[in-house]
């Protein structure tokens, strides 16, 4: 079995450099990015942008491109009186979340009301190559029990509207307001998956297939399984750690399925409990093991995931990177833990913004970008 390729999409928040409040400047930032040759996509609200990488076989190359994209887009934001933050929800009180002015996004806003207008949420999507749609559906079944662990590991949305939410990933709680969001159902075949999507389309639960927001799904545009469970991680290193773990889990799933096995059908109720626990506690508290309902420390469940995917990590050449990246993350905390520390007893939102700004551009030396000249037509993101 060939090593699968991997690609990543990251969503970012644009904020005012002085106040940290979201700024509605995504079209201007995308215009500047286009002049610099950066493919930057618009998201549902005008406070958000999305980057996407090329397809990579090598994790080191993925790391380099993600870092360069963050550095470049940060310069474009700076040129338009904005700051780029890798954070899954706004830490400050937003004045508004105006919807990006495209026909599709206007239709979504008209159909879903306040859910759309409060959408300023940023995630990270990892695409891993699979041979066909049937394989993607079966791999999704295998991934279901591990999705809460991936959420806990990368949680980056503890502070919202000037308050400590008490959750590591408040984004994941808000995100589930969409009728098509959350854990993917268990499907016996790709035909069953397609039948469910057809029902959702005919009922108006989704307006198009791009709005099937399950946390793992066959990609619409690429021959991949797309894993969408994560908050946008605070640092490039954490994003690449996520990508490496997702790729290894997909590779493990394909080996498992090739041996004639069938993924366990974890009950939706157990999976929802595991999701809630992951959102609440992140990597620092307890977790629910979806396969058997055990309650155990999240780090112990992480060890079980690592043990499961270790042969794949070795085969793909990613074991060393994952070991080093996890050691660093667990030593200093993930994005949510660092937000809470910065917020502290003084409820210092400015310190949270400073922490996020530094983490977003780790390894960068951003400089002001020049704007002007030419015409660039921005592209919608994948919401």
Curated annotation (Swiss-Prot):
It catalyses: L-cysteine + L-glutamate + ATP = gamma-L-glutamyl-L-cysteine + ADP + phosphate + H(+). Its EC number is 6.3.2.2. Keywords: ATP-binding, Ligase, Nucleotide-binding. One of its GO terms (biological process) is modified amino acid biosynthetic process. InterPro entries: GCL_type2/YbdK_subfam, GCS2, Gln_synth/guanido_kin_cat_dom, YbdK. GO terms for molecular function: ATP binding; glutamate-cysteine ligase activity. It holds the Pfam family GCS2. ATP-dependent carboxylate-amine ligase which exhibits weak glutamate--cysteine ligase activity. Belongs to the glutamate--cysteine ligase type 2 family. YbdK subfamily. NCBIfam families: gshA_cyan_rel, PRK13517.1-1. This is Putative glutamate--cysteine ligase 2-1. It comes from Nocardia farcinica (strain IFM 10152).
């Amino acid at each position: 079995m060939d090593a699968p390729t991997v690609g990543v999409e990251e969503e970012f928040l644009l904020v005012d450099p002085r106040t940290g409040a979201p700024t509605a400047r995504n079209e201007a930032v995308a215009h500047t990015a286009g002049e610099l040759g950066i493919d930057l996509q618009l998201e549902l609200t005008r406070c958000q942008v999305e980057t996407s990488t090329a397809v990579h076989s090598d994790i080191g190359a993925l790391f380099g491109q993600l870092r360069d994209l963050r550095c470049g887009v940060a310069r474009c934001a700076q040129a338009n009186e904005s700051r780029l933050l890798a954070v899954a929800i706004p830490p400050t009180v937003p004045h508004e979340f105006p919807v990006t002015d495209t026909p599709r996004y206007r239709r979504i806003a008209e159909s879903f009301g306040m859910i759309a207008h409060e959408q300023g949420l940023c995630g990270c999507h990892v695409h891993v190559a699979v041979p066909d749609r049937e394989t993607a559906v079966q791999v999704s079944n295998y991934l279901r029990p591990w999705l809460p662990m991936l959420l806990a590991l990368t949680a980056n949305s503890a502070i919202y509207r000037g308050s400590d939410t008490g959750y590591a990933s408040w984004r994941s709680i808000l995100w589930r307001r969409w009728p098509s969001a959350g854990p993917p159902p268990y499907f016996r075949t790709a035909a069953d998956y397609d039948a469910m999507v057809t029902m959702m389309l005919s009922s108006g639960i989704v307006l198009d297939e791009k709005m099937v927001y399950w946390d793992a799904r066959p990609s619409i545009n690429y021959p991949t399984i797309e894993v969408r469970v994560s908050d946008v991680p605070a640092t490039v290193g954490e994003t690449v750690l996520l990508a490496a773990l997702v790729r290894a889990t997909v590779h493990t799933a394909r080996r498992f399925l090739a041996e004639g096995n069938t993924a366990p059908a974890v009950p939706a109720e157990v999976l929802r409990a595991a999701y809630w626990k992951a959102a609440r506690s992140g990597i620092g508290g307890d977790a629910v093991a979806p396969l058997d309902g055990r309650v155990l420390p999240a780090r112990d469940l992480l060890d079980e995931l690592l043990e499961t995917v270790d042969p794949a990590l070795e085969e793909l050449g990613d074991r060393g990177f994952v070991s080093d990246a996890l050691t660093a993350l667990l030593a200093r905390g993930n994005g949510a833990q660092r937000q809470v520390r910065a917020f502290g007893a003084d409820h210092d939102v400015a310190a949270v913004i400073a922490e996020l700004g530094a983490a977003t551009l780790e390894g960068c030396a951003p400089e002001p970008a020049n704007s002007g000249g030419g015409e660039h037509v921005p592209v919608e993101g994948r919401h």
